[in-house]
Regions:
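A short, N-terminal "cap"/entry segment at the start of jelly-roll beta-barrel domains
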Residues: 1-12, 87-139, 224
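Short hydrophobic/aromatic-rich beta-strand segments that constitute the beta-sheet cores
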Residues: 27, 45, 79-81, 154, ...
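Ligand-binding loop in jelly-roll beta-barrel domains
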Residues: 65-89, 192-216
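Conserved hydrophobic/aromatic beta-strand scaffold that supports enzyme active sites
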Residues: 15-17, 35, 60-62, 142-144, ...
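Conserved short histidine dyad/triad with adjacent acidic residue
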Residues: 2-5, 11-30, 65, 128-131, ...
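Short acidic-glycine-tyrosine-enriched beta hairpin
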Residues: 49-65, 176-192
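Short, conserved beta-strand element in jelly-roll/cupin
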Residues: 29-45, 156-172
Length: 224
């Protein structure tokens, strides 16, 4: 059972919450790219070579499209998910290198070089990022991000993003009086094109799963 918060069939992108009783799937190539954040229970992913990876409540993981694996679930499980079912079936360069990806909030991060003060109200923050996964189409990406406090003006967001807050808190707003506070342990979903304003007064760390359509990626690259 589950509930979809977002479903764009043309893009092949959907996000929601999913609950399932125990089951064991068949070994086979995973048909989609999927980011998952486990809310309750656990699951073990077994790959072709017999390696088993168990993911439990509070943890996140990625199964890349094409990974040959088996889903083994011995208890009830509830998760948030983002699925990208690439309509173009972009060629996977090296299927043998695919693996279950486990983002870790303690992983090393690289400083983001911010160059445009107009993106912020007041001082530019210090931000860091660690990218874990970019799909074969270069549109679906998962990573770890952190930032010192900052305030950003409201504007339409150029991507669809599910964020899982690991540390700190942030107020997300549409600029029209609809403010929501998200703190460590919370998740927020923002669809592309939504009016989006970020205000944080403390250090924030999050996992992100972003889908940035190819045309937006190209425009962003051209703008840089």
């Amino acid at each position: 059972s589950g509930h979809l918060y977002y479903n764009d069939e043309a893009l092949g992108l959907m996000s929601g919450v999913w609950h399932c009783t125990p089951f064991v799937g068949k070994m086979g190539a995973y048909g989609v790219d999927e980011f998952m954040h486990v809310l309750e229970g656990s699951v073990t992913i077994e790959t072709e070579d017999g390696t088993e990876t168990t993911i439990s409540a509070g943890e996140s993981f990625v199964i890349p499209r094409g990974l040959v694996c088996k889903w083994k679930q011995t208890e009830d499980m509830r998760k948030f998910f983002v699925i990208f079912n690439d309509p173009a079936k972009s060629p996977i360069s090296d299927a043998s290198a695919l693996k279950v990806i486990l983002p870790n909030g303690g992983d090393a991060v690289n400083k983001v070089e911010l160059t445009d003060p107009s993106e912020f109200i007041g001082d530019m923050p210090t931000q860091h990022v660690h990218n874990y996964y970019l799909d074969a189409s270069s549109q679906f990406m998962v990573g770890l991000w952190d930032s010192t406090a900052f305030d950003r003006p409201v504007q339409p967001i150029d991507r669809t993003e599910l964020m899982c807050i690991l540390e700190g808190s942030v107020t997300l707003s549409d600029g029209a009086g609809n403010d929501q506070v998200f703190s460590a342990g919370d998740a927020a979903f923002v669809p592309k094109g939504a009016n989006y304003k970020w205000t944080s007064t403390e250090f924030v760390r999050k996992f992100y799963c972003i889908f940035k359509p190819a045309e937006a990626v190209a425009a962003s690259t051209a703008a840089e």
